[in-house]
């Protein structure tokens, strides 16, 4: 994130909200990276002075964590979100697909199981929310 903030002249406010009880939990490497890259590629607007990115994490069940990345970018139509969500489960490669999101979704499912992965929705800020559900594993 420091590299992105330096590259974009601190043109984005980043907020963190992680429950303390999840700080000792294991997550696969670079779990946020493709989501943050997508924000700067598709949602960041250099003409705005109110670009925001929220990174959150909490325990939603004894055995499940919910991590999320929310932005206040331009968002997507419901139809586009539905197509993107369906493409996450596709093994077919298409240059127009979001390879980073699909790769992350599939890595999560391989590591944590088929009940876990990414969910993409619109949010109240006008942008997108990408929610990551993973199994809670205490770091040893």
Regions found by a protein language model. Name each.
Residues 135-139:
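Two-component histidine kinase transmitter core
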Residues 1-133:
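Two-component histidine phosphotransfer core
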């Amino acid at each position: 994130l420091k590299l992105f903030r330096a590259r974009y002249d601190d043109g984005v406010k980043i907020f963190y909200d992680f429950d303390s009880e999840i700080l000792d939990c294991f997550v696969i490497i670079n779990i946020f990276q493709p989501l943050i890259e997508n924000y700067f590629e598709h949602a960041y607007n250099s003409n705005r002075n109110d670009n925001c990115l929220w990174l959150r994490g909490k325990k939603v069940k004894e055995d499940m964590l919910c991590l999320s990345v929310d932005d206040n970018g331009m968002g997507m139509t419901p139809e586009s979100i539905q197509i993107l969500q369906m493409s996450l489960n596709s093994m077919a490669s298409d240059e127009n697909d979001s390879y980073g999101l699909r790769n992350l979704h599939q890595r999560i499912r391989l590591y944590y199981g088929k009940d876990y992965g990414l969910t993409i929705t619109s949010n109240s800020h006008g942008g997108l929310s990408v929610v990551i559900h993973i199994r809670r594993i205490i770091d040893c």
